[in-house]
Regions:
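N-terminal helix-turn-helix DNA-binding core of bacterial DNA-binding proteins
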Residues: 16-47
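Beta-hairpin "wing" of winged helix-turn-helix
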Residues: 63-78
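Residue cluster at the C-terminal edge of the helix-turn-helix DNA-binding motif
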Residues: 61-64, 92
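Short, intrinsically disordered or compositionally biased N-terminal tails of bacterial proteins
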Residues: 1-14
Length: 148
């Protein structure tokens, strides 16, 4: 699908999880600035409703959308998609793209403690920094913009 690749036995691990892919889709519907019901957005974007509610709750908690309950309720976009990066969305979804556990800040590595350093860590950390930079360089507006 849009950015999501299926994890299969012997396959690849996606950088963008299904939940983040669904979040991008829901934001696509909300990008018109109008108020939409969660059910309407879910149906329009082919996102299963239970996922849509869970995702919209996370997006609301992160301040990206406003969710109003009740008869006149619904959800609408609060975030400026021109200033919200893919990295920001992944963080809002509680995800981070990590090459290795050793690139997680504060990770305790017994190898590095025993040997005083690790060239593998140095290389992975440099690659991780570039990957984070790339995720931060692409806004949701850019990703959602119609091409052609």
């Amino acid at each position: 699908d849009m950015l999501y690749s299926t994890v299969q036995k012997g396959g690849s691990t996606p950088v963008i999880t299904r939940e983040t892919d669904y979040a991008i889709r829901l934001l696509r519907t909300l990008a018109d600035g109008e108020r939409h019901t969660a059910a309407e957005a879910a149906e329009r974007e082919l996102v299963p409703q239970p996922f849509a509610y869970k995702i919209l709750k996370k997006l609301s908690k992160a301040g990206l959308v406003e969710v109003t309950r009740g008869a006149d309720g619904g959800c609408r976009l609060l975030a400026d998609l021109e200033k919200t990066s893919l990295y920001d969305l992944m963080e809002a979804m509680g995800e981070s793209c990590r090459l290795s556990g050793c690139t997680v800040p504060g990770h305790r590595c017994t190898w590095r403690e025993a040997h005083g350093g690790c060239t593998v860590h140095c290389h992975l950390a440099a690659i991780q920094e570039k990957l984070n930079g790339e995720l931060k360089a692409h806004t949701l507006a850019e990703i959602l913009r119609e091409s052609g």
